[in-house]
Amino acid sequence: HAKESEMGNDTQKIAPPKLGEPYLLTPGPLTTSYAVKQAMLRDWGSWDDEFRAMTRKMRAQLLALLGPGHEDYDCVPIQGSGSYCVEAMLGSFVPRDGKLLVLANGAYGLRAAKTMEYLGRAYRLLDKGDYLPPRGDEVAAILAEDADITHVLIIHCETSSGILNPVEEIADAVNAAGRKVLIDSMSAFGAVPLEVQRTNYVAMVSSANIAALTRI
């Protein structure tokens, strides 16, 4: 009975939707607090001093999540979906004469490979299916065999399955081979540690689109 009472008290602390709409329990930025909705009523000028200061603070706070060594990096906010961000990273960091090793174990790794086709850049795909993570030893073997590979894309958490891939293990293999690490941490950054000093990646992308309103 005590537990039921505690649960009842906790439930009462959750404010009901202000406008009477139902709770939405599906994934994505759907149910938001009234305070967030109120904040969105204000129009911001992109060059207003207050908006620029807020953006500067946000960038600094995101960089701090990278841990020691974050001073050598910059945070570049861009608009668009998560796939848009991944495409921007691949198109910017993999040169036209480079080659990317895409590590896939789900829909988003495969989508990155398709993006490389659209970009007209060389790539090699290691497809582990939907249930197995790529491992450092098999990545090391591919890099030893294929000298043309310049970059390796690691999916931190494969969103379609929820599999958390062994980023540090793979990054160790890539760095040992003298190649460069790119990370898609779309559904993990901010929830799972990803220290740059430990993985030595050259670029990482993430997004709040899965948990917050667009462009927040």
Would you name each region that the model predicts?
Residues 21-78, 83:
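A glycine-/small-polar-enriched, mobile loop at the entrance of the PLP active site in fold-type I
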Residues 1-6:
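Short, Lys/Arg-enriched N-terminal segments with co-localized hydrophobic residues
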